Amino acid sequence: MSTVALLFALSAAASPAADAATIAAIEATCHDYVDGQLEADPQRVARSLHPDLAKRAVLGDTPDERLGLRRMSKEELISLTRQGVLKTPKEQWNRSCRILDVTAETAAVRLETPWFVDHFHMGRFGDRWIIVNALWHPKPR
């Protein structure tokens, strides 16, 4: 076994599994984010987001920017939710939240819908988990 593989194996073994309450809280935050958009419920979306949210999508090189990013603030996402941009009848919902990693204070989560994939970094603030960073990409239509 290579040294790098051994280090990864040891670090994975040293990380205790998150308890059921932590997993449920992280999943609830992910569902507040996506279900709030699908319901057009801006308050539900807002409670899932850090005030200094960094939501970005990779654009690549543009005429105005090398390594371009589409940037979105918490306020912009809440405004789009209020407008009902993703409002969808509940019987058509198709979304999944998959927790990739959890530490005492952070979590990495993958959200997938038919329209987009989000990769979240969540932070634990007291007993609340909220989305601090989101890197997303649209799915081909």
Residue ranges with predicted function:
Residues 54-59, 67-116:
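Surface-exposed, charged secondary-structure patches
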Residues 24, 73, 137-141:
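Ligand-binding grooves and catalytic loops that recognize ribose/phosphate and carbohydrate rings
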Residues 10-43, 47, 51, 67:
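Short, low-complexity N-terminal intrinsically disordered segments enriched in polar/charged residues
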Residues 1-7:
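Sec-dependent signal peptide recognition
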Residues 108-110, 115-141:
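Short beta-strand edge/turn micro-motifs at domain boundaries
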Residues 65, 69, 129-132:
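Tryptophan-centered short beta-strand motifs
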Residues 59-61, 126:
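Solvent-exposed strand-loop boundary residues in beta-sheet-rich modules
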